[in-house]
């Protein structure tokens, strides 16, 4: 995850680029693949307007024309909604998919998270109809926000078998959900990559 640095109240683009160059150099040194994640929680996705969100992607492409990246998207303008509306994700989705060589991380939202498992599955599937880039689903546990719930095994399986979802990210502090995900994907031979930070560790 790339931290969007600020200086005097504005994004510090030189430090942003330097951070990614340092990460890439470290990955190259150790012989591992590193794909930067932009505009997620460390990128202040919930605080960026659409113009600044797009500018982060533009600045990355100016400095790294061929680098694969992952960008988080969330529901825009949903704070007063009483029902889940998949189209709230469309604005940021379109900004990401204007770029090549990227993946879209569909970050959870209160409206999506509070649905029962079957309707939650349907909500993700609705968003997937607009995907032209590979999709990654995202879950939180309630240690982060009180309304969050990790995926039940049935829901994880339903998302993992969707052809447009290549993986899933779970953010955990209290439970080893990432290990549950990895075990299910391995045992069922699912073509779906579990992702996690080191939150639980």
Predicted regions and their residues:
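Active-site beta->alpha loop and helix N-cap motifs at the rims of alpha/beta catalytic domains
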Residues: 1-150
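Catalytic alpha/beta core domains of metabolic enzymes, predominantly
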Residues: 130-137, 141-201
